[in-house]
Amino acid sequence: GWTGTALYVLAEWSPPERMTEAEEVRTLRKQMLRPWGVDFDQIAIGRGDSNSSGRRGIASTVNQLINRAVAHELGRSRPPFEMRPPYKGPGSVRARARIISSACIEGRLYVHESCQRLIHSYRHWMGENNDLKHPFDAAGYVAEYYLSPVTRSGAAYTLVR
């Protein structure tokens, strides 16, 4: 959630096994959104990694497939928001780490106590490319959008899943 000055991470979820995009969307809705009284219509932005779904033999990104699955789940032709990729250029991981660190110190980032993987990642990740980086990246893509001085200034910016 975003209050205009602070970002609240209310839930985390990682698929226990491979799932279709439709299964992911249904599970996200059931386990992450509805318990907080939220639905896809209240989502303003979505960020997803810039991977492709070539494993299925079609020229489409996973973000596009998630967008279609959200629209289908809601019985609409278009989703109320679009999953877009985050910026992953040189120095972007380090920049997100600085943004998140500053926000924590300034009281602009709050993480619900149920988000144990993210809390563990924030406490112990030291910059390596390991399992601790995945929760950091996922939360960082959205945190960057809301907490970065660049994006808050109204400058055009693209983020990744």
In which residue ranges do the predicted regions lie?
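Short, hydrophobic alpha-helical segments
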Residues: 142-150
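Histidine-centered active-site/metal-ligand motif
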Residues: 134
